Amino acid sequence: MSHPLSSLEYQPDILGEGYEQATLEFLPDTEGTVVATLIRKKTDQPTSKAVLYIHGFIDYFFQTEMAERFNQQGFDFYALDLRKYGRSYMSHQKLYNVYHLSEYDAEISQALEIIGQEGHDTVLLSGHSTGGLITTLYAAHHPDHPLIKDLWLNSPFYDFNMTPFEKKFLVPKLSRLGKRFPEMLFPSRLNRHYVPSLHISYQGEWHFDLEWKKPSYHWVRLSFVHAIHEAQKEIHQGVRLNIPTLLMHAHKTTYPLRFNRNAQTSDVILQVHDMIEHAQKIQGDVQLCSIQNGVHDLVLSEKPVREQVYQQLFQWLENKAL
């Protein structure tokens, strides 16, 4: 469903001054009406460069510091809240429900069309965690997209954080079950210290909506497991990317059973070595960058750490002439 500029209406966004949002409408799915939300923050001066950012699982866009750092570098910043997440969730929907990650192609394509209509000819596509998996495949499946010039991945979800035995035998079985019984539930295993380690009300420094980025989420639908597994299989087989790609990850993974410094200085959600292993299967110009003491969402790491993230990122962009 196309959204020409004449019909697109931006409204003030919850993030405050300078942030706007527009609702993108799509064909209904099995649950009914479907929308996504495009958020933008423009630079003070006209620019032809833009960023499009895609969030992770149980997440939404709230990282204002990231948007403002891109603005300072001369990029207009755009982010999507995908269907059934954050700003885009509707009461008749099951949170985060998806059967195939290609469902999100509609909002990514629509957002890119709008970004082009708004005067940009150069886009850095970016994704965190599940968003990193989604954007990797989007770039691979759209190798000749006229706008996408580079890809920045922040701890992409290239494999389940499970034992080798579970990855080989349990995940494929759960995925097959998910195709037949999509509503069946499975324990999520998400580390319960991660979100509290970030939020200002617990041990962190960030303000975000705990309904949209929940402190705990105990069960996932097998439809999600199936969608992720199918996408990861494609990554594992070796996709081709014809744009420069920067994949950033924390320097280590830990499994804190109670809150400690590891929760704020390492990835407690995904296995770093999985990202490295599967990134090496990608054909193309892919650069890996390890961030000492980084957390899963690297731009939410402690101040000195995230300064390293931005320094490395913007140096890479400069080297790639973006």
Feature locations, PLM:
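Conserved alpha/beta-hydrolase
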Residues: 59-67, 71-91
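Alpha/beta-hydrolase-fold enzymes
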Residues: 130, 134-220
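Catalytic nucleophile-loop/oxyanion-hole region of alpha/beta-hydrolase
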Residues: 57-58, 86-122, 305-306
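Catalytic active-site module of serine/aspartate enzymes centered on a nucleophile-bearing elbow/loop
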Residues: 285-322
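Short beta-strand element of the alpha/beta-hydrolase
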Residues: 48-56
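N-terminal cap/lid segment of alpha/beta-hydrolase-fold proteins
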Residues: 1-45
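Serine-hydrolase catalytic core
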Residues: 186-286, 290
